[in-house]
């Protein structure tokens, strides 16, 4: 058995999708489903087909009814024996009414329906083979071709259409009645003739209405479709006075103008009243300012400082406004720039730290005797002394002579340099400022002094003091002398005693004042 052709597939699905229940998705009800579940023989939309794919092919096998062309006859039979209607009725019969996809297709009803579709499709495949249609397949009746609707006929009432049809039938009788009427008019000599009563012999009511209509409008049946124009609902105006209508319209316009004018007047009155209230508030505020003697710049300053009286709720006034003065900020005095040193940080640090021990004993002992003064003055003096001690560093003059650059007086700008170096191609700063001769003299003096030595060092060349080895430091060179340490300890003891006395006095005064 070969596979069905693409044309066979399209033909089968065209007829299956013509069934009304197959025009919507089986799960969500979306229109025009283009996917199908072969396992259940139902039509699905693209969103629900994705949910079925996540279930797995053992529960639902999905294919497209438009894109896939490799359908087998067994799969087509599954779709023919199934359908949305049969699947929905089967699920309802077995009590499965949930909308959850996992719960629905993992239920007992879904398992039974899968087995049923599989058995029916197998039987249909064996019985019909490659036939397109099955005996049990429901074929929808072919709908008649749509007729072209007449615009006028759709807007005409059924009664009028029936009368028009009856008028076309009764036209010969009306034509035969006309010669009788003309002969009667000739015989009676111009007397008025009433309507014809020959139509009363007709037993039906419709023909009576037709005869009356024909008398009023004898040309209606001849005009065909044009005769129906009078039945669109238009009515002829009778006994209408246009002057009265015009007067009513003018009266309505006048009423509208009066209402608009009243609205404008009321709006202007509200604006005027609000302005009056604003002026009253302003006058009250000005009177308050006059009472408080605030005017000009003081008023602005008081508002800026948060002492304005316009936003205050209380009537209490501040006395600060009477003595308010404007303080103008003077230009700040620039602080003197600190000295910048390019010295060695290590040398300056150790020199400044050791300056305390280099001071005489009298100066150090005098610091401890200052406890007899008042506490405030003592702390100020001690703070200033400590600051001076810490900030005291070696200046430019404390550097050794060998490492210090010599100070030279600037050479006056004269013509001597031009005369001296006029023909020289290149000169140095030492040659220009006259430092070359002095440097040469110092170098020659050092070399003559060290000429007898077998080896020299940089310290010998630049006449720097030699550094002691790390192992040659003694305790006496590091620590101060013994008398100094004794005096230092004695000063510390005296300071500690005075501190304890001072602390006891403070605690006693606090207890006396606030209570223990």
Curated annotation (Swiss-Prot):
Zinc finger (C4-type): 25-48
Domain (Arf-GAP) ranges: 10-126
Classification via Pfam families: ArfGap (PF01412)
Listed result of changing residue 290 to G: In a breast cancer sample; somatic mutation
One cellular component term from this protein's GO annotations in UniProt: membrane
SUPFAM superfamilies: ArfGap/RecO-like zinc finger
Name of the protein: ADP-ribosylation factor GTPase-activating protein 3
Protein's organism: Homo sapiens
């Amino acid at each position: 058995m070969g596979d069905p052709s693409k044309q066979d597939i399209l033909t089968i699905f065209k007829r299956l999708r013509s069934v009304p229940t197959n025009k919507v998705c089986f799960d969500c009800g979306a229109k025009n489903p283009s996917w199908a579940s072969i396992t259940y023989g139902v039509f699905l939309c693209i969103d629900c087909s994705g949910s079925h794919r996540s279930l797995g092919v053992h529960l639902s096998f999905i294919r497209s009814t438009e894109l896939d062309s490799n359908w087998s006859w067994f799969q087509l039979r599954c779709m023919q024996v199934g359908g949305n209607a049969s699947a929905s009725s089967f699920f309802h019969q077995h009590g499965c009414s949930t909308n959850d996809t996992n719960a629905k297709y993992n239920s007992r009803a879904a398992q039974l329906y899968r087995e049923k579709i599989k058995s029916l499709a197998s039987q249909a495949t064996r019985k019909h083979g490659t036939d397109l249609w099955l005996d049990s397949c429901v074929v929808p009746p072919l709908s008649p071709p749509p007729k072209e609707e007449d615009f006028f006929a759709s807007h005409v009432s059924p009664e009028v259409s029936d009368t028009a049809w009856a008028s076309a039938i009764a036209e010969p009788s009306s034509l035969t009645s006309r010669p009788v009427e003309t002969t009667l008019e000739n015989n009676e000599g111009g007397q008025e003739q009433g309507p014809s009563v020959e139509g009363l012999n007709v037993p039906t009511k419709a023909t009576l209405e037709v005869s009356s209509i024909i008398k009023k409008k004898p040309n209606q049946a001849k005009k065909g479709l044009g005769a129906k124009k009078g039945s669109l609902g238009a009515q002829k105006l009778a006994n209408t006075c246009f002057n009265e209508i015009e007067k009513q319209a003018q009266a309505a316009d006048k009423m509208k103008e009066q209402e608009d004018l009243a609205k404008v007047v009321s709006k202007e009155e509200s604006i005027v009243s609000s302005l009056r209230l604003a002026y009253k508030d302003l006058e009250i505020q000005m009177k308050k300012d006059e009472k408080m003697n605030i005017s000009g710049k003081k008023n602005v300053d008081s508002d800026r400082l948060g002492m304005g009286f316009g936003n205050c709720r209380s009537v209490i006034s501040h006395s600060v406004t009477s003595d308010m003065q404007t303080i103008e900020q003077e230009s700040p005095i620039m602080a003197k720039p600190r000295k910048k040193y390019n010295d060695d940080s290590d040398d300056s640090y150790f020199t400044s730290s050791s300056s305390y021990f280099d001071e005489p004993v009298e100066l150090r002992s005098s610091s401890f005797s200052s406890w007899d003064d008042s506490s405030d003055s003592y702390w100020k003096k001690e703070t200033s002394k400590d600051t001076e001690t810490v900030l005291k560093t070696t200046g430019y003059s404390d550097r050794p002579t060998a490492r210090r650059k010599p100070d030279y007086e600037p050479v006056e700008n004269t013509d001597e340099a031009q005369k001296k170096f006029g023909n020289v191609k290149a000169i140095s700063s030492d040659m220009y400022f006259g430092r070359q001769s002095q440097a040469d003299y110092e170098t020659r003096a050092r070399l003559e002094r060290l000429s007898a030595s077998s080896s020299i060092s940089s310290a010998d060349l630049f006449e720097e003091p030699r550094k002691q080895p790390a192992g040659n430091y003694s305790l006496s060179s590091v620590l101060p002398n013994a008398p100094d340490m004794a005096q230092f300890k004695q000063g510390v003891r005296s300071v500690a005693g005075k501190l304890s006395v001072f602390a006891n006095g403070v605690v006693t005064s606090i207890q006396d004042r606030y209570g223990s």
